[in-house]
């Protein structure tokens, strides 16, 4: 957020106070727990927000639960406009390599384009970093599509290893020893 404010030449203020003792809400098992987690984790500073055009910056949008609740909170605090900027590309595919993301059909970006996501979340505008922009931020000139420098499957759907227990859409598939080739 500090970097975005500096590049956009707009003031940076702590309009949302974050409780650092609450963990990542997107990995919680139920909507009810995720919603409670968002309420416990974030509080709006109405004195700084009321009557202003606000730009929220977040690392990602997974289901959209946190984004939606934060936008509602900021609007309730009196924001005139709410815009959101995301520091990663849209998460369109599940991660099967250690990040506890939901099934693909639960990912907001898997089923909606950016304008639909903006409407669902309740923001006036929504923008994401592109895949190449993410690579530039990590010091690369761009993504090498023949041999990606990093795992970016959650953004591109191009998994570095085949998923033996998933079909081509990332849905659970029945494993079969009959399909396995023996060396």
Q: Language-model segments: which ranges?
A:
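PRPP-associated nucleotide enzymes
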Residues: 1-183
């Amino acid at each position: 957020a500090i970097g975005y404010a500096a590049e956009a030449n707009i003031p940076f203020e702590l309009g949302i106070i974050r409780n650092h003792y609450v963990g990542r809400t997107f990995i919680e098992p139920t909507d009810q727990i995720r919603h409670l987690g968002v309420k416990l984790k974030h509080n709006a500073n109405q004195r700084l927000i009321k009557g202003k055009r606000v730009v929220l910056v977040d690392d990602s949008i997974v289901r959209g639960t946190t984004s939606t609740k934060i936008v509602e909170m900021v609007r309730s605090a009196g924001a005139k406009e709410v815009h959101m900027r995301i520091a990663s590309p849209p998460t369109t595919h599940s991660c099967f390599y250690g990040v506890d993301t939901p099934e693909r059909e639960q990912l907001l970006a898997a089923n909606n384009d950016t304008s639909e996501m903006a409407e669902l979340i309740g923001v006036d505008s929504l923008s994401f970093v592109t895949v190449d922009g993410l690579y530039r931020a990590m010091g690369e000139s761009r993504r090498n599509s023949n041999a990606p420098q990093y795992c970016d499957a959650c953004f591109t759907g191009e998994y570095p290893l085949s998923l033996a227990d998933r079909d081509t859409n990332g849905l659970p598939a029945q494993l079969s020893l009959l399909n396995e080739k023996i060396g």
